[in-house]
Structure formats: structure tokens, C-alpha cells
């Protein structure tokens, strides 16, 4: 061991000793604070005097409750902070830091050794930093700078100086395995080790291997919208999650994880990335799929189709007579032009076109749709649209109140009163005594007739409950009828926003109307329908969310992005995607995020391109980039491996037998995650049924919420964003993948592989494979 390595190991030992001392302190303080919280909860009501005899006593009770709640909240906050710090220290025990820069600040004379780890550490005085958090301003030089003149930016301005050296450490269980001086951001030795490992059931976040271009994403803070367009395996998702950790660190006094929202592609992906932020010492941000949001808003009224059911239709239903009509609808309803059309239609409703529902009780009208319509377009026409609806709602409430009052005198009510229980009589009686301020000592009493009136009031109010709810929720507006009307009336023609309609417009309208009548809402209609509903009834925005992260952004339509922008008006946005993996029909013919630049305007938008692919071995990347136009811009990381293999087979039986053998071979090589990737969910289910005899094989569906190690059968579109040690592409034939519209789907399947890629073909291989023939080994089973 060299003298320098010996000195560095001594420092590691000292730092770990300090970490252990702090762990001991925090374990004690965490236990103490936990007990404080338990004690406060246990004695909460003992320390509060509840007295409601008069207003002053009641006010004193409220103040006492608030004080106790504040004490509890402070104790819980202290316990949370102590627990968080304890968790950070425990993670640092084995690997306290991973890098070092030697920096001589201009005008300061001495060179400072800056050690960098996943969290900061100071000495016992709290004044000297032993380790700097990777997110600290000074740490940016480790990722961005090479030895020589360098600077980093602090809240007080730039700090300049000379970066003399940059060191990298591989530390395991407190022992330095290796250390080396490097002039690169991250030495290939560390990156090779990391990338050569097996895929895991959760995404790893390894801040020691952040590359310079990824660091630009992480620390970007200059525009409202950041677009990251990255090749498959370029690390865009992990960089974006590290970006969230960085923002939580930088703005820790005014930003919390609850104010950050990640739109994930599916539930399984949510599970896959769930460990990244906790690994970095931060709480998980909120996660939701866009479909979950649509269901939350619309599933009470409709059976809402999900995006994967739509995609399954696109992939498997080309024989449907309505296929071309629906495809045209999918494409047009995803456009900004359709978004503008709905806004224009909403403007037209100011003058005419609103459709209302009757409000009735027991079949008798309280207000007919015609009366409501006439009232809306006659009264308060100078007010804003939403205020006109509020006035209309107030008028309806008055009508319902009068109808309810009149109903109390009806014979059915009097008959029902004769059948009420003693308990109901007692409740009405007690209510009236309290209402009139009678105490137990009062000599006066409630008149029996008043009790009967109170019972009648309660009984009718229960029956009218649905009507009141209907008015509160503006259920008297017939949104489905207005949406259908948009396809057939003057609203579509004269107020359409100027965009040219598809030739199939009338047929699209007929299909949409028919399905709405059946209570079904297609995926391509869900966001437009919700937008129309919001524009009419009043937009429900969320101003508490300050940052929105959209992964697999190529799967979102321009329409959906416009909707998300309106939904979170106070938020910045980071979107990540790769149009070479755009598998949904609405993205046909789109190859970049140009349309997103208009979301907030070019001056508020930055674009970062990630062209280096780290996930797969060089042979796999060389093959996959040959599958797509412009693929030569993708740069493979120089990690050796086996050439992808295409095996031609005669029939399905031969294919299945060969897959069984290949799975066995991959397992023997030590691969823990193996995916058999199919074109569709229907094909996946069939393949799983055939291969269910393979030990530990699992079927992944759109309902799967967790990815586990082993062998999985999975449709391509659910595998996006996830990586596997070895991938088997099921039947990569020209019959399966022969249309240009399937090129991106095929590319997505092949780019899931980290170490091994095996393709099978029954008959003629896909034309996409033939175009990349120079980068694949071929064999056949006769």
C-alpha cells in the first residue's frame, strides 16, 4: 500500500469514527424525541380543558387546543428531522464519500481538499466540513470541471480559483478498494463497474457516476420548462430524480417533497423509481399516473379507457371496420388545434349552445331544461361565464328550496311521519329544544306539532339530498351533450379555431356520441372532455405543486401538456423523453419536442440533449441505433459484451422450445432479470400460458404494481423505462414488425437489454433487423 493510500485510509477511518459518534447521538435523540411525541399524544386531552358553556370558555378551549397541536407538531417535526439525519449517517457508514477535488480559491492562498459524498458531515464544532454534499455549490466542480481554472456559483456570486486535482475513490465497507487521479468527470473504471452489475428491481441512483451533461440537468434552474431529450439508457430519469433531490436541497427552507409531483407512465414504474430519493436522503415526491388523475375526475360518470387499452386496440384491431376512423380521431384529438377548438367552442357557449338537464322530484319538474336555458341566456349576460352559472345556481336553489317547503305538506310525508321510530321523534325533539335555547331546567316545552314539522323537514331534506348535491356539483349542465354537440353543430364549424378538420370528422363524431351514450369515454376523449367540463364549470387548479416532472413525455399529447400547464399554474416543469420510443398512435410523424417550446414560450424553455447511452453494451447499442433514422447520433459507452443474436425458427413450437433453452442458459450465466418482450398484452398472455412451466416466470400486465426479479413476460409498452440483464424479443418477424409505424416499438423492445439481447423470428425477420444486419449475429434452427 502506497503512503498516500495509507494516509487516505487513515482519514476514512477517522471520518467513519466521527460518523459513528454522530449516529450514537442521533439514535439517542431520535428515541428521546419519539418518546416526547408519544407522551404528548398520550396526555393531549389531559392538558386541554374543554368548556363550551359560553363563548369565552369556548374560545379558551380553542386556544388551548391550538397550543397543544403546535407543541405536538414541533415535536413531530424535530423527530422527523432527527430520523432523516440518522438515516443519512447510516448510509454513509460504509461509503462516506466517493470523490475529492483540490481547489485553491483565488486570493485565499491555501489549497482546500473538498471531499464529496451523498450527504454533508462536519466536525464536532460544526465549523469544518469533512464531507460536502454532492449537491453543494462547490461540489459542482467535481462534475463539471477539469484541472485548471475553475469556478462555482454560490448565492453570493461566483467563486473562482484553480482546480488542481480531482480524485475518485471506490470504498466498500469503509475500506478504500482503489483511488485514482482523473482528468475526466468520472473515470471509466467506476462507470464500468456500475454498468456491469445486474439490473435491480428498483432504479439505482449513483451520484458518484453523474456525468457532466447529466449534471447540467440536475442543477438547471434558469427556465420554467426544461426539456430533456435523451437516447434510451442515457440516464435521463435518474438525472431528473437527482434533480429533484438537488432542488429540495437548494430550496430546503421553502420547498418540500409534497410540492413536487412526478407523472409516471404506469404503476410498476412508480415502484421501480420509488427508492431513488430515499437513497439520496430525501422523502419521496408525490407520484401519480395521468390515468389515475383522469379516473379520479371522471370514473364516477364514465367507464374511462386507459392508454394501454387504446394502444392494444391500435396494435391488434386493424381488422375492425371503424379502425381508420378511430385512428384519425386519436391523432386529431391529441393536437393543440383540438385544444384551441374546445376553447373556441366554450367561447361560443356565451351566446348559445348550452345544454341543461331537467331538475325534477318524483317525476315532476322543478325547473325544465328549457326554463334553465332561457334563464341563462336572458339574465346576467354581462357577467363572466362562471359568474353567470353561479347566479343560475342560486336561482335554482331558490326554486328547490320552495319546492322542498311545499313538499312537506304532501300526504306522503304525513303518512311517513306516522311510521317513524321513537328515536327519530326523540332526535327531532332534542334538536328543537336546543334550537330554542331550552335547558334541562326549562319549564316550557316543545309543541308536538312543531316536532311533526321538524320531522317533515328532515324527511323531505333527505329525499332532496341528491337534488341539492346535483346543483352544488353543477350536474344540471349536460356536459356529454355539449361535447357531442361540438362534433355536429355550428360550434364545430363557426367557432372551430381555424384548424382543418380530418376528412373522417363526421364519422369521428358519430363514434364519439355512440360511446358516450353507452357511458364509455375513450382515452383520446378523456382529457378533451375534462377540459371542456373545467372550462364550463370552472377550472380546478393546484397551486401548491411547485414542480412537475413528466417521464416518458413522448407518450403525452400536446393537448395533455396544455392541460397539465393549466392544472398546475404555479409549477415549473421538467419533461423527459425519447421520440424514438414514442409508441402511441398520436405521436406518429413527430420526432422532437418542438411543440413543447410553445407551452411557456422559447424564452422560458431550455432543451438538453443526452446522446450517450450507458445502459447497454457497445454491441447492443451499435445494433439498436442502426434500427432508427438518425441513430448514428447515439454514442455507445465503451463496455464490451456479446453481439446481439437473431435466431430464425420454423414455427411456434420450435420458438418456445428455444426460448426455454435460452432462459436456462441466461440463468446459468448469472443473469437475474430476464424479459421475454412481446408486441402486445394479448401476445404476452398467450406466451405466458405456453411457457408457464418455466420456473419463476411471471406475467406483467398494466395492473402490475411491482417489478420483481426473475423471468417476466411483458408487452413492449410496459417495459419502457425499465432495464433487464437479458432480453428475448419474441418473434421479431416481418409479419409482426413490418410496418413503419412499429419501428419505434421494436426499437424500444431491443433497448431494454443491458448485457444480452436475443431475437427470434418465425420466418422472414423484420425489415428493421435487415437494415441493421451488420451489427447482429444470425443463426437458425432447422
What are these regions (language model features)?
Residues 1-41, 191-313, 719-720, 727, ...:
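P-loop NTPase Walker
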Residues 1-207, 211, 215-216, 777-782:
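Extended, charged low-complexity regulatory segments
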Residues 87, 91, 196, 200, ...:
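Short, charged/polar micro-motifs that form catalytic or ligand-binding hotspots
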Residues 93, 99-101, 107-111, 530-533, ...:
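Domain-scale macromolecular recognition modules
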Residues 100-102, 227, 262, 575, ...:
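A structural signal for short, well-ordered beta-strand segments and their strand-loop junctions
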Residues 115, 161-201, 208-275, 642-724:
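Conserved motor-region signature of P-loop NTPase helicases/translocases
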Residues 250-548, 555-563:
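Alpha-helical nucleic-acid-binding subdomain
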Residues 267, 275, 279-283, 288-292, ...:
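Conserved helicase motor core of SF1/SF2 NTP-dependent helicases
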Amino acid at each position: 500500500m502506497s503512503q498516500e493510500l495509507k494516509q487516505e485510509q487513515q482519514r476514512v477511518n477517522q471520518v467513519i469514527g466521527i460518523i459513528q459518534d454522530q449516529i450514537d447521538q442521533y439514535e439517542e435523540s431520535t428515541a428521546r424525541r419519539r418518546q416526547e411525541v408519544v407522551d404528548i399524544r398520550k396526555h393531549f386531552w389531559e392538558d386541554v380543558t374543554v368548556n363550551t358553556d359560553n363563548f369565552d370558555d369556548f374560545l379558551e378551549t380553542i386556544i388551548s387546543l391550538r397550543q397543544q397541536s403546535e407543541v405536538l407538531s414541533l415535536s413531530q417535526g424535530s423527530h422527523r428531522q432527527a430520523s432523516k439525519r440518522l438515516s443519512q449517517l447510516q448510509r454513509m457508514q460504509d461509503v462516506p464519500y466517493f470523490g475529492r477535488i483540490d481547489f485553491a480559491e483565488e486570493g485565499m492562498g491555501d489549497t482546500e481538499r473538498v471531499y464529496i459524498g451523498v450527504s454533508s458531515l462536519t466536525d464536532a464544532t460544526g465549523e469544518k466540513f469533512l464531507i460536502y454534499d454532492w449537491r453543494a455549490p462547490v461540489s459542482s466542480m467535481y462534475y463539471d470541471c477539469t484541472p485548471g481554472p475553475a469556478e462555482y456559483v454560490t448565492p453570493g456570486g461566483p467563486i473562482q480559483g484553480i482546480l488542481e486535482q480531482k480524485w475518485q475513490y471506490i470504498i466498500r465497507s469503509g475500506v478504500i478498494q482503489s483511488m485514482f487521479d482523473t482528468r475526466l468527470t468520472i473515470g471509466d473504471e467506476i462507470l464500468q463497474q456500475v454498468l456491469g452489475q445486474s439490473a435491480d428491481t428498483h432504479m439505482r441512483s449513483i451520484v458518484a457516476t453523474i456525468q457532466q451533461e447529466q449534471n447540467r440537468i440536475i442543477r438547471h434552474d434558469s427556465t420554467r420548462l426544461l426539456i430533456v431529450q435523451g437516447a434510451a439508457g442515457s440516464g435521463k430519469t435518474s438525472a431528473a430524480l437527482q434533480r429533484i433531490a438537488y432542488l429540495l436541497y437548494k430550496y430546503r427552507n421553502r420547498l418540500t417533497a409534497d410540492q413536487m409531483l412526478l407523472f409516471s407512465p404506469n404503476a410498476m414504474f412508480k415502484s421501480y423509481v420509488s427508492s431513488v430519493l430515499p437513497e439520496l436522503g430525501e422523502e419521496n415526491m408525490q407520484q401519480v399516473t395521468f390515468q389515475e388523475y383522469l379516473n379520479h375526475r371522471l370514473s364516477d360518470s364514465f367507464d374511462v379507457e386507459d392508454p394501454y387499452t387504446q394502444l392494444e386496440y391500435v396494435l391488434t384491431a386493424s381488422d375492425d371496420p371503424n379502425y381508420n376512423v378511430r385512428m384519425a380521431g386519436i391523432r386529431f384529438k391529441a393536437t393543440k388545434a383540438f385544444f384551441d377548438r374546445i376553447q373556441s367552442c366554450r367561447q361560443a357557449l356565451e351566446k348559445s349552445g348550452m345544454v341543461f338537464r331537467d331538475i325534477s322530484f318524483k317525476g315532476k319538474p322543478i325547473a325544465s331544461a328549457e326554463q334553465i336555458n332561457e334563464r341563462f341566456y336572458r339574465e346576467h349576460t354581462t357577467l363572466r361565464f362562471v359568474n353567470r352559472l353561479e347566479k343560475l345556481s342560486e336561482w335554482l336553489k331558490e326554486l328547490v328550496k320552495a319546492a322542498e317547503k311545499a313538499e312537506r305538506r304532501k300526504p306522503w310525508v304525513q303518512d311517513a311521519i306516522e311510521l317513524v321510530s321513537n328515536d327519530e321523534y326523540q332526535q327531532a325533539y332534542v334538536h328543537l329544544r336546543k334550537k330554542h335555547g331550552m335547558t334541562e331546567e326549562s319549564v316550557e316545552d316543545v309543541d308536538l306539532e312543531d316536532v311533526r314539522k321538524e320531522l317533515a323537514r328532515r324527511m323531505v331534506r333527505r329525499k332532496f339530498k341528491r337534488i341539492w348535491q346535483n346543483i352544488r356539483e353543477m350536474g344540471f349542465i349536460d356536459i356529454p351533450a355539449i361535447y357531442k354537440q361540438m362534433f355536429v353543430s355550428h360550434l364545430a364549424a363557426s367557432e372551430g379555431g381555424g384548424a382543418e378538420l380530418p376528412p373522417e370528422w363526421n364519422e369521428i363524431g358519430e363514434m364519439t356520441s355512440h360511446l358516450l351514450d353507452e357511458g364509455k369515454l375513450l382515452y383520446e376523449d378523456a382529457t378533451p372532455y375534462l377540459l371542456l367540463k373545467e372550462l364550463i364549470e370552472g377550472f380546478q387548479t393546484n397551486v401548491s405543486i411547485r414542480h412537475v416532472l413528466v417521464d416518458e413525455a413522448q407518450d403525452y399529447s400536446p393537448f395533455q401538456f396544455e392541460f397539465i400547464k393549466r392544472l398546475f399554474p404555479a409549477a415549473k416543469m421538467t419533461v423527459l423523453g425519447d421520440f424514438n420510443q414514442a409508441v402511441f398512435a398520436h405521436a406518429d410523424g413527430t420526432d422532437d419536442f418542438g411543440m413543447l417550446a410553445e407551452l411557456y414560450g422559447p424564452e422560458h424553455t431550455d432543451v438538453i440533449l443526452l446522446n450517450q447511452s450507458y445502459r447497454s453494451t457497445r454491441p447492443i447499442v451499435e445494433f439498436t441505433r442502426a434500427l432508427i433514422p438518425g441513430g448514428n447520433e447515439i454514442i455507445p459507452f465503451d463496455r464490451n459484451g456479446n453481439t446481439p443474436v437473431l435466431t430464425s425458427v420454423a414455427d411456434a413450437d420450435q420458438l418456445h422450445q428455444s426460448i426455454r433453452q435460452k432462459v436456462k442458459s441466461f440463468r446459468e450465466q448469472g443473469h437475474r432479470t430476464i424479459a421475454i418482450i412481446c408486441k402486445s398484452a394479448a401476445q404476452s398472455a398467450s406466451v405466458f400460458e405456453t411457457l408457464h412451466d418455466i420456473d419463476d416466470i411471471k406475467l406483467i400486465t398494466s395492473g402490475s404494481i411491482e417489478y420483481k426479479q426473475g423471468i417476466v413476460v411483458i408487452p413492449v409498452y410496459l417495459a419502457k423505462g425499465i432495464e433487464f440483464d437479458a432480453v428475448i424479443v419474441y418473434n421479431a418477424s416481418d409479419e409482426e414488425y413490418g410496418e413503419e409505424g412499429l419501428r419505434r416499438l421494436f426499437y424500444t423492445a431491443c433497448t431494454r437489454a443491458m448485457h444480452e439481447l436475443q431475437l427470434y423470428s418465425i420466418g422472414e425477420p423484420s425489415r428493421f433487423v435487415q437494415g441493421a444486419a451488420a451489427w447482429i449475429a444470425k443463426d437458425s434452427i432447422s
